[in-house]
Amino acid sequence: VFEEIEKPIISVVEKMNKMGIKVDKKILKDLSLKYHQELARLKTVIWEEAGEEFNINSPKVLSLILFNKLNLGDKRQKKTPTGAISTRESELEKLRDKHPIIGMILEYRELSKLLSTYIDAIPPQLDKNYRLHSTFILAGAATGRMASNSHNLQNIPNKTVLGRAIRTAFM
């Protein structure tokens, strides 16, 4: 396996690591503007639905709004170790049809994550040629497949339309 498969690809992987991947900074800048605007819009609408301004990013505060003020939970909802009703994505998905605020909160979280982890985080990490460098590791995973770290390019989202838009910046 090493002689026939892994050895011939070592030089290719080294070249990939050294060269990096070209990133279209303008696409990320445009996405940043668009997603920040949508985040601000969602925040306003969520506050309107809740009837008050609150920290959407605080699970504790969000739990109070959703389950105490809006009475959206039931006894089957999972609780956190502190006894608060969980606001994890999997728990909120179960409530999506109960109130429009749930879908808005899930979208708000997705946008916030994409902005902080990818869209706004990648540009400062680009080299002078607008390339992002990663370290690809042959047989880096337990299954034998290649792994990537120090900018894990295998983690760029692809399950949602919002996430897939980020991939268009990679050339």
Each model region followed by its residue ranges:
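Conserved "right-hand" nucleotidyltransferase catalytic core of DNA-directed polymerases
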Residues: V1-L162, M171
